[in-house]
């Protein structure tokens, strides 16, 4: 919608939306579109599409299926964000940047694999230290070269844990890459991204150090799967986490629903 063809932007419709909000005395949390890449981008640069554990590259459609390590996708998202910031940096309705959307998932492409191996080398320095930490000698899984290390092997718990830590770091790196042009051009406009409570494999405490405001999505399910009091306790626990990560300052509930949702059934 914003970039129907490479390097051709269409902001007219968004101009109308932003202007209407300003006329009504309202403010906008403007989101960047990185969570769902356009079809032309996937077709021209197939390397931006994620690769799953068994080596298959994801299809072009859907969302949250881009490679966080892809130099092409990082460059394209930064370019888009720069264009957005240039256009709306002085707009009276712009109050906050909502960067991306619900960062999640992992990619097992060659770029991510090589980056993972570099990440491990930085952490452990030597293969001897890595093998000892992972107890790789068990079942004869000793690594003798960094290039031998895969991104997925459920038989090695240490590898699995480090892969999750690496993926968390890649998401943070991607987030910072997105925020760079926004902070350069609109230094007085805060940046946030929507957390997902206690999302598995994500260290939001580390993420919080890079954000100006903490925000979260919360979808209590009003059905028979769980008693209301249990959902209330779970929601309050997540609210407390957000308050803790924000240092006691206000945080934002970016997404919520008062009723059931189709994807929750």
Model-identified regions with their sequence ranges:
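Short, solvent-exposed loop/turn segments at secondary-structure junctions
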Residues: 1-3, 199-200, 260-263
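A cross-domain feature marking catalytic cores of carbohydrate-active enzymes
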Residues: 1, 30-34, 99-101, 193-195, ...
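Carbohydrate-binding surfaces of carbohydrate-active enzymes
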Residues: 219-222, 228-265
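Polysaccharide-binding and catalytic clefts of secreted carbohydrate-active enzymes
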Residues: 42-44, 54-224, 228-237
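Acidic (Asp/Glu)-rich catalytic clusters
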Residues: 16-25, 85-92, 204-209, 242-248
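Aromatic-lined substrate-binding rim segments of carbohydrate-active enzymes
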Residues: 1-59, 81-85, 172-186
